[in-house]
Design a protein with these regions (language model features):
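Structured catalytic/translocation cores of nucleotide/phosphate-coupled proteins
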Residues: 3, 39-42, 63, 90-92
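A short, structured beta-strand/loop element
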Residues: 16-58
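Negatively charged, low-complexity tracts enriched in Asp/Glu with abundant Ser/Thr
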Residues: 1-16
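Intrinsically disordered, low-complexity segments enriched in small/polar residues
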Residues: 2-3, 26, 66
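Acidic, low-complexity intrinsically disordered segments
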Residues: 55-92
């Protein structure tokens, strides 16, 4: 699953290629940031735009990450169909 998408405020977003599971197209996503003891993370799915596992992010931060994911979903879908990496971007 390691197609890099972006880094914003030291939070990295990676995603899988597009997968076909039970006749449905899905993309797995993972947000992560380094902390003093390892990593905070939030793992989820598109098109559901939901998180399945989280650790270390506050509820407000998770809301912001979910909003970021919703706003960027069309690009992530496109990149996931094309294999991701070469289209990735970085923002400070």
């Amino acid at each position: 699953m390691k197609n890099y998408y972006s880094t914003v405020n030291n939070v990295i977003l990676t995603h899988s290629d597009m997968l076909l599971e039970n006749h449905a197209r899905r993309v797995y996503v993972r947000f992560e940031r380094q902390n003093d003891h390892g990593f905070d993370f939030a793992e989820g799915l598109l098109p559901e735009n939901t998180f399945t596992k989280t650790y270390g992010f506050s509820e407000d931060e998770l809301f912001e990450l979910q909003d970021y994911l919703r706003c960027n979903a069309p690009l992530i879908w496109e990149f996931a169909q094309e294999g991701g990496g070469m289209f990735a971007k970085s923002a400070a």
